[in-house]
Amino acid sequence: VEEIQDLVEYQIMAHGAFEVAKNYVTYRYTRSLVRRSNTTDEKILSLIECCNEEAKQENANKNPVVNSTQRDYMAGEVSRDITERILLPQEIVEAHREGIIHFHDADYYAQHMHNCDLVNLEDMLQNGTVITGTLIERPHSFATACNIATQIVAQVASNQYGGQSISLTHLAPFVEVSRQKIRKIVEAEMASIGVDPGEEKITELVETRLREEIRRGVQTIQYQVVTLLTTNGQAPFITVFMYLNEARDEREKKDLAMIIEEMLLQRFQGVKNEDGVWVTPAFPKLIYVLEDDNITEDAPYWYLTELAAKCTARRMVPD
């Protein structure tokens, strides 16, 4: 269009029709503004009608027929348009279009937001936090801590783009909180029926119930992460860090080991899809750290490393 208009303008001036040329320059500028203002219309309409092949193939974690995803893509087109026309130097835009460089995340660049987080769960769980104007106090059980953690993950994902990471170590202290809580319940139950099973039996009952709570808590994390939809129309991009030597003492380390074991067991099992078939979930990503206490066969936590290896062999996501 611009090349043709250059030729038209040149020919008008070549014939000495300077007044006509002046009017044509004004017309040309006006039409240029109109074209620039409507650069997103076609793409946005194709998104709404689900006929934008680029959007369908762009992100395997986003379903372009879902309303929330379409709204994110629509906002992304507006951001990309503003970024290319106003925010970036033209030479950067041209280099991107020509494939010389790739300018990442233009669909979020217009807004003042960041892309990744290392979430400080420890501070928010130990000292409380605020979510949408509601005070969330320190949880009184491991299961509640897991539920709050997923709410934090969802809030973070909805206010940034990109991934986030949490550490299971920050959940480990709440295993002891649940242990003491369950112990009081078991002791009260035994007292109510006039039975004294002895300390060993009580401890056994407590640990059995504690294991079940850990199972439910980890399951909450797994299923919340893959079923939550954030404001950017997808499940949170989350990585779970599993490092035994982050624990503050041996008691907490053993509790952390129980959480890690359950996380690996549930990942090995997978989640059921809409057909009831066990499949590999895309998230959370799991990072298991090797150290002296889990890297050799005679190490105390070698069983976790074996489980992690089996889990990797069966549930590695090719991304």
Language model regions located:
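Conserved catalytic cores of very large enzyme subunits
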Residues: T30-D319
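Charged, amphipathic alpha-helical regulatory modules used
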Residues: V1-C51
